Amino acid sequence: MGCVFCKKLEPASKEDVGLEGDFRSQTAEERYFPDPTQGRTSSVFPQPTSPAFLNTGNMRSISGTGVTIFVALYDYEARTGDDLTFTKGEKFHILNNTEYDWWEARSLSSGHRGYVPSNYVAPVDSIQAEEWYFGKISRKDAERQLLSSGNPQGAFLIRESETTKGAYSLSIRDWDQNRGDHIKHYKIRKLDTGGYYITTRAQFDSIQDLVRHYMEVNDGLCYLLTAPCTTTKPQTLGLAKDAWEIDRNSIALERRLGTGCFGDVWLGTWNCSTKVAVKTLKPGTMSPKAFLEEAQIMKLLRHDKLVQLYAVVSEEPIYIVTEFMCYGSLLDFLKDREGQNLMLPHLVDMAAQVAEGMAYMERMNYIHRDLRAANILVGEYLICKIADFGLARLIEDNEYNPQQGTKFPIKWTAPEAALFGRFTVKSDVWSFGILLTELITKGRVPYPGMNNREVLEQVEHGYHMPCPPGCPASLYEVMEQAWRLDPEERPTFEYLQSFLEDYFTSTEPQYQPGDQT
């Protein structure tokens, strides 16, 4: 990620000369078109055709390799009678891996047969089975993970190169008096003969040999490799095999986490085994049939910056079962003591994570429609994930109406969406600009002192919120770009992600020279 995108995707200049006049002179039909996803069904949404579609950041599953003996990367406790309980290091014979999420396996130690989550296992003796191998994660996520608590100087990981297919990168946590803790990255290059090297004077037959060498001597690296980066067990891809439409009685609602206009959010347990979050919708909020169709699409959206949809109860009252995020909504988090103490680098990083998730949705041509801090969830290590994507389109409540309803999020909604129902990725970009103000102000309601009608009238005439106190001018400029009246002049989420990820990047090269001393 980084500077390459910034240069390629630089949005138009700041001045919108004549834009307001053009906006006002056109008719609604000339300016806007109907919501392109109205009436869409799951049959026209991109289907998962390969593991690449379902990549969730640090997923380690392997398919199509011909390897049938796999090793467990983590402990796992069976959730159903069809699952296998296993411990880290246990070996399996994979019997059937035709379904991507859950594979049928037989334990070589116990002889028991059942299903295992595919992202909890890897081929024996492969690079994917190594604790230091993190697979297809971004450079920025590598930095986030290595800078988290518990990692000493010299903590490291190896990941797939973002720029060179088939190559790898080594990321190391370092420290010095001037910069404190920071991360350095090294390219691992591949020889034509099949070996690997960082510097030509030290070549190795395998990545494992390379790691063993640099754990014994730094040999030109910034620091000796001391320990693999700490990690937590990933979310399984779904609750269990075929656990999609589930029985309401399999969910125990334990503690109410929040209440909204259309229902409540609970901490719950599925099948007496798995902690989950459960959104319960009031009867009449949306059509169960329409919800189930949309949910079939939503479950195909998989990215580590999107809250994973686990399962549904499709009869009223509808239950939406998702992964549990320990700190709740970003809005509530910003308002409490820990959120109030966050500094600008933390806030910008949280914004970058949201932009990353939205960039994925942009690539998938999926529209959120209700992007705001209340619909971003926060987990350990300040990980942010996007929630409630796509649900706003299904709400049937008369009060959820931009013209007169009190429940519609006018202050976050682009004018073309609020006035004419023109929801697009670009209207999500507008909402992201408003979300940036929520971050900078630690949860302040947008457009303070203005009601919804005033906001709609003023925004249509080109009004922008002034720069929030303490907000850098360069960040406010991005907000203003997101609020351009012409949707096509707003930046892409790909650009926003790159801009925010590189916001504090110094002038040092992205990768360290392999021969540095």
Curated annotation (Swiss-Prot):
Q: At which positions is ATP bound?
A: 257-265, 279
Signal peptide location: none
What interactions and quaternary structure are annotated? Interacts with ITGB1, ITGB2, MS4A2/FCER1B, FCER1G and FCGR2. Interacts (via SH2 domain) with SYK (tyrosine phosphorylated). Interacts (via SH2 domain) with FLT3 (tyrosine phosphorylated). Interacts with PTK2/FAK1. Interacts (via SH2 domain) with HCLS1 (tyrosine phosphorylated by SYK). Interacts with SIRPA and PTPNS1. Interacts (not phosphorylated on tyrosine residues) with CBL; FGR tyrosine phosphorylation promotes dissociation. Interacts with CLNK.
Which topology term describes how it sits in the membrane?
A: Lipid-anchor; Peripheral membrane protein
Keyword annotations for this protein?
Answer: ATP-binding, Cell membrane, Cell projection, Cytoplasm, Cytoskeleton, Immunity, Innate immunity, Kinase, Lipoprotein, Membrane, Mitochondrion, Mitochondrion inner membrane, Myristate, Nucleotide-binding, Palmitate, Phosphoprotein, Proto-oncogene, SH2 domain, SH3 domain, Transferase, Tyrosine-protein kinase, Ubl conjugation
Domain SH3 residues, every copy: 65-126
Q: Which organism is it from?
A: Mus musculus (Mouse)
Tissue specificity remark = Expressed in natural killer cells (at protein level).
Enzyme class, one word?
Answer: transferase
Q: What is this protein called?
A: Tyrosine-protein kinase Fgr
| Residues annotated as the enzyme's active site | 370
Q: Which residues carry this modification: Phosphoserine?
A: 13, 50, 206
Q: Spell out the subcellular localization from the entry.
A: Cell membrane; Cell projection, Ruffle membrane; Cytoplasm, Cytosol; Cytoplasm, Cytoskeleton
Taxonomic placement: Eukaryota, Metazoa, Chordata, Craniata, Vertebrata
**Record-level GO BP terms:** bone mineralization; defense response to Gram-positive bacterium; innate immune response; integrin-mediated signaling pathway; negative regulation of natural killer cell activation; peptidyl-tyrosine phosphorylation; positive regulation of cell migration; positive regulation of cytokine production
Explain what the UniProt record notes about the effect of disrupting the gene for this protein.
Answer: No visible phenotype. Mice lacking both Fgr and Hck are normal and fertile, but show increased susceptibility to infection with Listeria monocytogenes. In addition, their polymorphonuclear leukocytes show defects in cell spreading and adhesion.
What is the reaction catalyzed?
L-tyrosyl-[protein] + ATP = O-phospho-L-tyrosyl-[protein] + ADP + H(+)
